Amino acid sequence: MRLLILTGFILTLLYACRSTKVIQKAIEKKDTVAVVVPVDVPTHDDTVKLIAAIFDGYKAIEYKTFAAKIKVDYFNSKGKQPDFVANVRMRKDSIIWVSISNDLGIEGFRVLIDKDSIRVMDKLANTYQVKPLTSMQDIVQIPFSLSSIQELLVGNPVFFNRDSVIAYTKTEKGYTLLSSGELFKNLLSFNNGFAFEKSKLDDKDLMRNRTADLSYFEYESKTGVMFSTYREMFLSHQNKLDIQLKFKDYKFNEALSYPFNVPKKFKRIQ
């Protein structure tokens, strides 16, 4: 299927959203020497103060527009799959534009996502599709939004509610917060400088055995924004998927265009 590469990229992001949205509330630490303190024990006041300090120290990325070139490598149960480059442009709460090409720079697909729909041009087959965003929601089985995908791409924690924190840990390496949603647990880890390092998502239904590990590395601040330029996603449900994202040429708050002109010769398909 010609849309396999495109679907793999977008569904990778959406699956992570899924495990984050339903999970939206957890952040935990693997360090075995850490002391976990439930929020509702006698140290509640100290817990509240620590959680507040973490959120005061952590600065979510604020932006109006964002653009980046992303090198995508991924592995599934059959081994390494063909890598590709995704050029992404976004206007917050409005639009996501993606151009997918191979290492030689030959564009294969172009995608436009807004609050209601997803449009896909297959430049290899001279076809295009227009589908409601809800069709993607059905595939990943969560009511995600445009803004959820944007937050995931820019590197902010998604679907996390500080009011749902049930435990925390403090170690020499940093902090973790654990929250629990209806279907998932979400574990967020921060270093001592309050940089967001990891989100670990676990399905509360052990029969589904659904997990996701999202890790953030190689922070830099070339644009005045602390930004993770290398990320790893390990997804496990019925199959396992390992995705590596390398961000290059990223920029914030610059004027962007979102060209999506369908040639007359392209055939619309369902």
PLM regions with names:
Residues 1-5:
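Positively charged n-region of N-terminal signal peptides that target proteins for export
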Residues 68-110, 116-117:
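Post-signal peptide N-terminal segment of secreted/secretory-pathway proteins
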Residues 13-16:
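C-terminal motif of bacterial Sec signal peptides marking the signal peptidase cleavage site
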Residues 19-26, 166-270:
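Gly/Pro-enriched, hydrophobic low-complexity segments
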Residues 95-146:
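An acidic-aromatic
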Residues 18-71, 75-81, 267-270:
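N-terminal leader/targeting segments and the immediate start of mature chains
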Residues 58-66, 77-82, 89-94, 170, ...:
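Edge/loop elements at the starts and ends of beta-strands within beta-rich repeat scaffolds
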Residues 31-32, 47, 94, 117, ...:
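Coil residues (strongly favoring Ser/Thr
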